Regions:
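Residues within helix-turn-helix
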Residues: 230, 241, 277-279, 290-291
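Short acidic-glycine-tyrosine-enriched beta hairpin
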Residues: 76-90
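Short beta-strand His + acidic residue motifs that chelate non-heme Fe in jelly-roll/DSBH
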Residues: 71-73, 95-104
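Terminal helix-turn-helix DNA-binding modules in bacterial transcription factors
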Residues: 249-288
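A hydrophobic/aromatic-rich effector-binding and dimerization subdomain
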Residues: 100-167
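Short, Lys/Arg-enriched, Trp-marked, Pro/Gly-tolerant hinge/linker segments that flank
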Residues: 166-173, 187-231, 249-254
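Short hydrophobic/aromatic patch on the recognition helix
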Residues: 84, 243, 292-293, 297
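Generic protein-terminus/edge-of-domain signal
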Residues: 1-80
Length: 297
């Protein structure tokens, strides 16, 4: 019997195993490798179970949890992977499987693994950074409607069909295009998720504005310098990419642009007051050099 649950892993825990290739991952679960650089995996067909492992992966992963996975540990909070949840990970990220002290039901989860070498030199390779959800935290997973789940499942199925087809000159292009289509759908569904969580998002915007004002009112900029997107994302308990995408969706500006606009507003206010010199204003707003401040205008 096999049970899969991806967990956020804290740094103080034990050894990390490097899983560099798709085949190494397949071997963990006794699954067939259809291609050295890409595979569609069906965990219900796993012939081996993994009780516990922490791993640093060398490829992209997209998992569709098609059955309840149980509790996901994130910091000190627990989250449930409900049916129809998509979780994505990028090369270099650390994830884990922990089946200790819990029953192990067979999961219906499926996934796509693809190595960066597969997409190198392709359109997808050039634009992979646009799929920012690969850098979202695990508690920022995508929750699908029934119709969306059918679409994602169909995309994964088409990749599987192409992998099972005898290799010819069209194989790589079709595989990569189908992966790109899958990711485009996930991007669309994430945007829908942002919209359906509109009120929660607006609360985050209000908190962001409050923290941004406090950053300068409390003169944090003098010691810490210019505020970063990561600073505010951490305060909101979100990953920088998820936070940035949320701000962009709600305001039409990137989080960095939003911060810069606020700095410009404050700078104009303080300069027009005539109490401080330009250099003093620049210093209090976090600029190390006044000439960098001047470039804002």
């Amino acid at each position: 019997m096999f049970y899969l649950c991806i967990r956020l892993i804290t740094k103080h825990m034990d050894e990390i195993t490097k899983i560099e290739t798709v085949d190494q991952y397949d071997q963990l679960f006794g699954l067939e490798t259809l291609h050295p650089l890409v595979n569609v995996i069906d965990f219900s067909k796993a012939t081996r179970s993994v009780e516990y492992i922490r791993m640093n992966i060398g490829f992209y992963c997209l998992f569709l949890k098609d059955a309840k996975c149980g509790d996901l540990t994130y910091g000190r909070k627990n989250y449930d992977y409900q049916e129809g949840t998509v979780v994505c990970m990028a090369p270099g990220q650390v994830s884990g499987i922990d089946n200790r002290n819990r029953p192990a039901p067979r999961t219906k989860s499926i996934g796509v693994l693809f190595h960066p070498d597969l997409i190198r030199g392709t359109s997808l390779g050039q634009h992979i950074k646009n799929y920012t959800f690969f850098s979202y935290e695990v508690n920022e997973a995508l929750h699908l409607s029934d119709q969306e789940r059918e679409i994602v499942t169909d995309c994964i199925h088409k990749i599987r069909i192409e992998l099972e087809h005898p290799i010819d000159k069209h194989s790589k292009q079709l595989i990569v295009r189908n992966i790109e289509l899958l990711l485009d759908y996930c991007m669309r569904f994430y945007e829908r998720q942002f919209i359906t969580r509109n009120q929660a998002n607006k609360d985050i915007i209000v908190k962001f504005e409050q923290l941004l004002d406090e950053y300068f009112q409390n003169q944090v900029a003098i010691t810490e310098g210019l505020p970063s997107v990561k600073y505010f994302a951490d305060k909101a308990c979100l990953s920088p990419n998820y936070f940035g995408d949320l701000i962009k969706k709600e305001t039409g500006k990137t989080a960095q642009e939003y911060i810069q606009c606020r700095i410009i507003e404050l700078a104009k206010e303080r300069i027009l007051e005539g109490v401080q010199t330009v250099s003093q204003v620049a210093y209090e707003l976090g600029f190390q050099y006044p000439q960098h401040f001047s470039r804002l205008f």
